[in-house]
C-alpha cells in the first residue's frame, strides 16, 4: 500500500505541470459547458410549457427584446435569442460570440399589465401545499409585485444582455481553475519556505492539505466577489442606457423585495428561513453570498439617478 502511494506521489511530482493544466482545463470546461450549448442545456431546463408543448414567446415580448438589443447597441442581434421561460424574472446563459450564441428566457408575467393579468392569474401557485387565492389580500399583494412597467421589463432584460455580452459566464467559470492553480502555488511556496521538499512525506501531506484548504477558501471568497461584481456591473450598464432604464431598474428591485416580503408572510416559518424582513434572500450557506443583495442593487441604481450618471 505504501509503495503504491509512493509511486503515485512520484508520478504526480514528475508530471505536476501537465496534470495541473489538465485539471484546470477540465474544471473550466465543466463550468462553461452549459454556456457553450445553451440550446441543449439551459434552455431545456428553463423552458416554459403549455399543454404539453414548449410555450412560444409572444410577439409583444419579441418586440421588447429587439428594442433592448437595439438600445444596448448589439450589432449582431442574431447572436442573442429569446424564449419563453418559467419563473418571474428573466434568466440567461451563453456566450454571444460563440456559434451557439446566448439565450435569454423571458417569463410569462412580462406579458401582463395592470389591465391584463392573464400571464399571472392563469397560473396555479401552491404555497405550503395550498393553492394561492389571487383574490385574497396576500394574493393581490403578490399579484401587484409581479406586474412590471415596460421600463422595468426592459431593464430586467437589458441586465441579462449586459451580463452575457461582457463575458460574465467566462469570468465566473475562470475562478475555479485559477484557485486550483493557486492551491498548487500555495503548496510549492509553503514547502520551500519550511524546507519540506525533501522532508517527511507526512509533513508534505499536511502542507498539501493546508494548501487545499486555502485554495477552497480562496475559491469561496473569489467566486462570491466575482458574482457580485458582475451583478453590479450588469445593473450599471443596463441603468446607464437611459434614465427610463434606471427608473425601471429601481421599480424592478422594489417589486422583487415586495414579492419576497409577501412570500415570507405566506410561507410562514419556511419563508422566515428563506427571506429576510427586508426582502433579501438569506444565503444558502453561512460563508457564501453568491449574489449581491437586492437592497444594495436597488440603492446603487438610486444613487445613479441622484447623481445624474445616466
Curated annotation (Swiss-Prot):
It is found in: Mitochondrion inner membrane. Residues 1-17, 191-200 are mitochondrial matrix. The chain crosses the membrane at residues 18-38, 170-190, 201-221. One of its GO terms (cellular component) is mitochondrial inner membrane. It is a multi-pass membrane protein. Residues 39-169, 222-310 are mitochondrial intermembrane. InterPro entries: TMEM177 (IPR026620). Belongs to the TMEM177 family. Plays a role in the early steps of cytochrome c oxidase subunit II (MT-CO2/COX2) maturation and is required for the stabilization of COX20 and the newly synthesized MT-CO2/COX2 protein. PANTHER family: TRANSMEMBRANE PROTEIN 177. This is Transmembrane protein 177. It comes from Danio rerio. The gene is tmem177.
